[in-house]
């Protein structure tokens, strides 16, 4: 019967998996066999032969035994893809061709990146801040004005008007008129002196955070400029009251102070010859009150500088905190990515193991089918049948039966090659022997005839003499 197959012996020879005159080991229904591949692609063993290069066939004497079996070829060399698995299923009977079932590799499902909790918290905080900003009205200017004019009118107006940005927004005039309504309406006018600093033009900004930042920056710049003005005023007043020194540092400092236009304005506006020298309550005629006034001014300047430094330190601390938070977020992201990669690797390993288990299960099922088929057909390969070349009949096992783990265990020595039937090689040897025998017989007959001829000629010569 023809064992219809997808892979033929000729294909295996073409691929280089098997070669002519190569010993082949295979198993059928748990029984191991050995054979030799001939030049035409046939496999001959003791009682079992696979013939016909286009199909794997074997001759059955007796009933048709249907079932499944595996042929395992060992010692074959070829491409690595074909070299990994040398198991070929074949079917006994003429019911149809085998279709190879190729299992699709299950691609490991990549886990979808879940949003990180830190990013969600940041987004929620931003949304809450935006809602709070939308709910709060922008009453910064009104609040600043109300806080400013709660103070007494006798205090310095330059320190009071720092937090108000109305004059910066307009930038047209330095004179301001503000009205405060109480039980008795009073109008107070404050004149600002022309200051040498340049005013920063304010751009229209809709974001309230940026407005607050600009206000803080403007306040800081104003405080710095005022502190510089106070220091320059004090230096000028000290130079006027101190005797002239001969040191080169004093000469250079006076030259630098007189060269700048700002110092000239300050000197002219706050000097002893100016009209505004009584604005700060300084009496230049009395020597007793001058050092106290200077000390008070120094203290005020130091306080302003300290406030500026504190603000700068706060800003630096905020920046450092932000940087630390960013670094922590980056580290968390890296750790999450590493965990995801390790999970992917584990999934791949699990999938590979599952595939291996599935293949093993298929092989086990195939073996079970073999046993079931043999049991379902009691007439096939029964002890009374003529199936003498197969190993299903355990009562009468064949002489060439080997252990079941013959092919799977590569450490066992190969069994002896069984006696092969009459082949072309033995025919040629017999023919050569026959030819040699015939030639020897002919040569012997020729030598005998020659000796007979010589003896006859000798006898004739003797008779003539």
UniProtKB/Swiss-Prot annotation:
Protein name: Putative uncharacterized protein DDB_G0272516
Compositionally biased intervals (Basic and acidic residues): 208-220
Compositional bias annotation for Polar residues: 264-294, 392-407
Positions in coiled-coil regions: 214-242
UniProt keyword annotations, A-Z: Coiled coil
Basic residues bias locations: 443-465
Family matches, as InterPro entries: RAMA
Residue numbers spanned by region Disordered: 95-377, 392-465
Signal peptide feature range: none
Source species, domain of life: Eukaryota
Segments of skewed composition (Low complexity): 117-137, 177-190, 226-263, 295-376, 424-442
Location of the RAMA domain: 6-91
Protein's organism: Dictyostelium discoideum
Biased composition annotated in UniProt, kind: Acidic residues: 156-169
């Amino acid at each position: 019967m023809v064992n219809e197959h997808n892979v033929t012996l000729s294909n295996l020879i073409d691929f280089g998996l098997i070669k002519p005159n190569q010993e082949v080991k295979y198993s059928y229904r748990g029984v191991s066999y050995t054979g030799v591949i001939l030049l035409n692609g046939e496999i001959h063993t003791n009682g079992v032969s696979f013939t016909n290069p286009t199909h794997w066939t074997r001759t059955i004497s007796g009933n048709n035994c249907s079932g499944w079996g595996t042929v395992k070829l060992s010692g074959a060399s070829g491409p690595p893809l074909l070299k990994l698995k040398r198991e070929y299923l074949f079917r006994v009977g003429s019911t149809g061709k085998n279709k190879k079932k190729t299992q699709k590799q299950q691609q490991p499902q990549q886990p979808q990146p879940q949003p990180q909790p830190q990013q969600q918290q940041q987004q929620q905080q931003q949304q809450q801040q935006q809602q709070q900003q939308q709910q709060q009205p922008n009453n910064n200017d009104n609040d600043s004005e109300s806080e400013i004019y709660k103070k007494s009118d006798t205090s310095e107006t330059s320190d009071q008007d720092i937090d108000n940005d109305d004059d910066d927004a307009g930038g047209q005039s330095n004179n301001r008129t503000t009205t405060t309504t109480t039980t008795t309406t009073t109008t107070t006018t404050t004149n600002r002196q022309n200051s040498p600093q340049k005013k920063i033009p304010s751009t229209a900004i809709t974001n309230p955070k940026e407005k607050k930042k600009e206000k803080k920056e403007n306040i800081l710049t104003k405080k710095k400029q005022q502190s510089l003005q106070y220091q320059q005023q004090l230096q000028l007043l000290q130079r006027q009251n101190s005797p002239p020194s001969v040191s080169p540092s004093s000469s250079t400092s006076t030259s630098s102070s007189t060269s700048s236009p700002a110092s000239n304005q300050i000197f002219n506006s706050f000097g002893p010859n100016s009209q505004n020298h009584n604005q700060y309550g300084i009496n230049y005629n009395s020597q007793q009150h001058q050092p106290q006034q200077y000390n008070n001014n120094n203290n005020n300047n130091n306080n302003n500088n300290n406030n500026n430094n504190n603000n700068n330190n706060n800003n630096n601390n905020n920046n450092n905190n932000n940087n630390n938070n960013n670094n922590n977020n980056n580290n968390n992201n890296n750790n999450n990515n590493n965990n995801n990669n390790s999970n992917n690797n584990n999934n791949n390993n699990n999938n590979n193991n599952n595939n291996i288990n599935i293949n093993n299960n298929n092989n086990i099922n195939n073996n079970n089918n073999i046993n079931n088929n043999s049991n379902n057909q009691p007439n096939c390969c029964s002890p009374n049948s003529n199936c003498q070349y197969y190993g299903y009949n355990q009562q009468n096992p064949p002489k060439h039966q080997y252990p079941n783990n013959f092919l799977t265990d590569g450490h066992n020595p190969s069994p002896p090659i069984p006696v092969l039937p009459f082949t072309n090689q033995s025919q040629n040897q017999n023919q050569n022997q026959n030819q040699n025998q015939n030639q020897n017989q002919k040569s012997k007959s020729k030598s005998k005839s020659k000796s007979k001829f010589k003896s006859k000629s000798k006898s004739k010569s003797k008779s003539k003499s």
